[in-house]
């Protein structure tokens, strides 16, 4: 049945019920005590005024007024002590007719209706989509589900013309509540929505095997979450506006692990990096790299404490060797470079310049017994003639090839 046919049928039924009410008003007026006739006549006049124009787009608004007229009339009649049985009977029939009119007005009709951007087929009440229906858009999109007050509301399935599919809850025309969104490329989101955006708790499964499970806000990862990569690596921690930010833990597939601060999707701030081989770094991070002050502990017991740049010892730092040796000084790109002091476990020490991890250029070598010699060094070894200062005060020029370091 078409929309027009449904409308005509409904209007015919409305007219019949309105006629019933009018007839009962007239009969009630004839058979009521004289003191009620004026009241009944006044109510009938108001009733007729309201119902003279009962076009479909206006009639639903008149129902409330008609209900008010009937209820007021009924209350005033019932308060009259001289009311007779016939008056009661006709008033009861008027109220029943009004009940039928209300029921008819709220009863959904099945319609087929065209809109500016598509066609609707389904339940229709008071000139609005209400109940279950199907809407096929001119663009090729399709919605099948529940409507309320002319908007998608309740459970529904929306098929997009690009192949995406949403299946879940709606509120006031938008994704709201729990739903599943299947993307044409294979990605799937299952979780909570708010005003068309992922919001709340949800799981996003990527076609490449990655998966995120956690909190969302305004369509982006936000709050606590777990991201599992297809290679087995895993991040557990905080997100902000779609990126890792705050405290987090990253466990790499090869056994490495990071625990610490994140900013803008990168390791940044304070943190600890554990290597699978037993090495460990504690300190500052920037853009995923060791940068700033930190401590690197090797699995063999060696320890470096100092400044880092781009994952390397760079700046001022101290290196403690497991055998008791120690270096304090400048570093560049992971090697001793600049001024420094190297302490040997024997009690001797070297003070001077370093390059490429070795003493280079001017330097002084101090012996445990108080002697020292000054001169040039190359690749950590004395070269040329050195001046040797003895602990007893003697000074002499000595060929450096005779020195043992």
Language-model regions, residue ranges each:
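Serine/threonine-rich, low-complexity intrinsically disordered segments
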Residues: 4-5, 9, 23, 42, ...
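Long, low-complexity or tandemly repetitive, helically biased scaffold regions used
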Residues: 4-95
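Intrinsically disordered, low-complexity PEST-like regions enriched in Ser/Thr and acidic residues
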Residues: 92-118
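Conserved anchor residues at repeat-unit boundaries in beta-strand-based tandem repeats, strongest
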Residues: 99-103, 119-130, 142-153, 165-176, ...
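Acidic/polar residues in short coil/turn loops that connect beta-strands
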Residues: 116-117, 126, 139, 162, ...
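Residue-level structural signal for beta-strand termini and adjacent loop
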Residues: 135, 148, 181, 227, ...
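Short, surface-exposed secondary-structure junctions/capping segments
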Residues: 368, 387-396
């Amino acid at each position: 049945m078409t929309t027009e046919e449904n409308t005509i049928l409904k209007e015919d039924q409305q007219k019949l019920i309105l006629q019933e009410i009018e007839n009962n008003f007239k009969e009630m007026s004839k058979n009521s005590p004289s003191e009620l006739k004026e009241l009944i006549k006044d109510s009938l006049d108001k009733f007729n005024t309201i119902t003279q124009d009962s076009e479909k787009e206006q009639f639903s608004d008149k129902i409330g007024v008609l209900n008010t007229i009937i209820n007021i009339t009924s209350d005033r009649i019932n308060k009259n002590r001289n009311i007779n049985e016939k008056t009661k009977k006709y008033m009861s029939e008027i109220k029943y007719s009004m009940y039928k009119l209300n029921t008819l007005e709220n009863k959904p009709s099945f319609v087929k209706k065209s809109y500016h951007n598509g066609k609707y087929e389904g339940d229709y009440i008071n000139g609005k989509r209400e109940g279950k229906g199907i809407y096929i858009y001119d663009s090729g999109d399709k919605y099948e589900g529940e409507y309320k007050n002319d908007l998608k509301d309740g459970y529904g399935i929306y098929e997009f013309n690009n192949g995406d599919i949403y299946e879940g809850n709606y509120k006031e025309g938008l994704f709201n509540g729990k739903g599943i969104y299947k993307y044409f490329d294979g990605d799937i989101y299952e979780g909570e929505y708010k005003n068309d955006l992922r919001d709340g708790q949800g799981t996003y499964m990527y076609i490449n095997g990655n998966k995120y499970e956690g909190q969302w806000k305004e369509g982006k990862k936000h709050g606590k979450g777990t991201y599992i990569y297809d290679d087995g690596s895993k991040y557990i921690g905080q997100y902000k506006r779609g990126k890792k930010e705050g405290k987090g833990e990253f466990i790499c597939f090869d056994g490495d692990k990071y625990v610490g601060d994140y900013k803008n999707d990168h390791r940044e701030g304070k943190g600890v990096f554990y290597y699978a081989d037993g090495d460990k770094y504690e300190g500052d991070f920037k853009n995923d790299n060791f940068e700033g002050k930190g401590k690197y502990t090797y699995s063999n017991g060696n320890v470096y404490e100092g400044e880092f740049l781009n994952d390397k010892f760079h700046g001022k730092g101290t290196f403690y060797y497991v055998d008791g040796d120690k270096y304090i000084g400048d570093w560049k790109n992971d090697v001793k470079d600049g001024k420094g002091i190297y302490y040997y476990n024997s009690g001797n020490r070297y003070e001077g310049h370093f390059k490429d991890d070795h003493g280079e250029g001017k330097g002084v070598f101090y012996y445990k017994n108080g002697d020292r010699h000054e001169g040039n060094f190359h690749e950590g070894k004395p070269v040329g003639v050195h001046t040797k200062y003895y602990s007893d005060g003697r000074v002499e020029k000595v060929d450096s090839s005779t020195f043992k370091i």
